[in-house]
Regions:
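N-terminal acidic, glycine/proline-rich low-complexity segments
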Residues: 1-252
Length: 252
């Protein structure tokens, strides 16, 4: 039994909410959602009630043991975390616990791994850029990317998430039901949904949809010095001081 937690910031972006709905319907292994930060706006609080109406448990930190139980009736530890926000809660958890897999929307793979002729126009010639989720808590990102308590890290970064295919008009056209009752603008890039989709495929938890839409390469993340939310992140084929990760480099 694989226990899955999703970390979301539902005050900031509707993408996280759409992703939770997708996971609730696709993954019978979803243990619950950690909200970081807990919503303070009226819209965010209403979204919490909506999430609970889908039968999803809401936590304020990654639970050590919880449902679902294994065939022996024993609650198992969290094994997989999908992160659509800051890495704060992950950094706290892996101080004393192990994870089999962390999948997140974050990081960047640019030059020279992704050459300019294959990069999105906005990223051509760039080897490092600011990336929102890492920069929400750079100290946590730094700690997580060095942690020996995470077996595998998979990064789905802005070099693929910003592609025009990553919308309800293209690859998500069969999932438009996710928008029912929710304000989603045309052409909205679905960063977190793409990362979670790929993570579920890696572990065979995605029901009838089991084909990757992204291609990956083993890389080492790097930054040009920790500078808070101005930190620029990239990827290297050579060791950088961070652990080796599997990062999306392009589309199938």
């Amino acid at each position: 039994m694989k226990n899955v937690i999703y970390i979301a910031d539902i005050d900031q972006d509707i993408d996280d909410l759409l992703t939770i709905r997708y996971m609730a319907e696709r993954s019978v292994f979803l243990k619950g959602v950690v909200l970081d930060p807990m919503p303070t706006s009226d819209v965010g609080k209403a979204r919490v009630k909506l999430i609970e109406s889908w039968g999803v448990k809401v936590f304020d930190s990654i639970p050590e043991d919880a449902e679902p139980k294994n065939p022996m009736g024993v609650a198992e530890p969290t094994e997989i975390v999908y992160c659509g926000g800051a890495l704060t809660k992950v950094a706290e958890y892996v101080k004393d616990h192990k994870l089999k897999q962390l999948v997140m929307n974050g990081g960047f793979v640019g030059e020279p791994i992704v050459p300019s002729n294959k990069a999105l126009p906005k990223f051509r010639g760039k080897s490092a850029v600011r990336t929102f989720n890492f920069n929400c808590d750079v100290a946590a990102a730094d700690a997580v990317l060095k942690s020996d308590n995470i077996e595998q890290i998979i990064l789905v970064g802005k070099n693929v998430c910003h592609d025009d295919r990553n919308t309800f008009e293209v690859i998500w056209k069969d999932e438009t039901y996710l928008t029912e009752g929710l304000p989603v603008r045309p052409g909205k890039k679905l960063h977190d949904l793409l990362a979670v989709y790929e993570g579920l495929v890696f572990y065979g938890l995605n029901g009838y949809k089991d084909n990757h839409v992204l291609v990956y390469k083993e890389v080492y993340p790097f930054n040009n010095g920790l500078k808070g939310n101005m930190t620029e992140w990239g990827s290297s084929l050579e060791p950088t001081g961070y652990k080796k990760v599997l990062a999306a480099v392009g589309w199938v």
